[in-house]
Amino acid sequence: LLSSAASDVYKRQVKKINKCLDNKTNSIISIFSGRMADVGKDPVPIIKKAVQMTNKKNKVEILWASVREPYNYIQAKQLGCQIITMPPKIIEKVSNFGKSFDRLTKDTVIAFLKDSRKSRFRI
């Protein structure tokens, strides 16, 4: 989990940036949540705090950058991120939300079967 020292650095950065912004200029604070997660840091507390710190400025938006897994989309929405950047493969997986587990499993097996036939390997 994110150490309190590292967490404080992120919070201080957002606080400093937020102080510099006014209510007249559209602004985006981009937080590279995926990179935090890549090194074992939980980005959720930082994003939550950033949204809280900036919520009084209606022209400031928080961006959850570097989504690594589909569930990050849900986390970002729940925390109030206004912008979420996702690679195409993650967008495709998000489109599976709401599918039954059985349907997703069947679709995966069918895709695997198609790929294995294309490879001409025998299974």
Indicate residue ranges for each PLM-predicted region.
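Single conserved hydrophobic/aromatic residue that forms the stacking wall/gate
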Residues: 1-6, 10
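Catalytic cores of alpha/beta
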Residues: 11-20, 69-81
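C-terminal helical cap(s) of enzyme catalytic domains, especially alpha/beta-barrels
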Residues: 93-122
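Active-site beta-loop-alpha junctions enriched in small/polar residues
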Residues: 8, 32-36, 65-73, 89-91
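Structural preference for beta-strand elements that scaffold enzyme active sites
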Residues: 4, 26-30, 59-63, 82-83
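Glycine- and other small-residue-rich loops at beta-strand/loop junctions that grip anionic moieties
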Residues: 7, 39, 62-65, 101
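Short loop-to-alpha-helix "cap/lid" segments that border enzyme active sites
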Residues: 28-29, 39-58
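Bacterial c-di-GMP phosphodiesterase catalytic domain signature
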Residues: 13-38
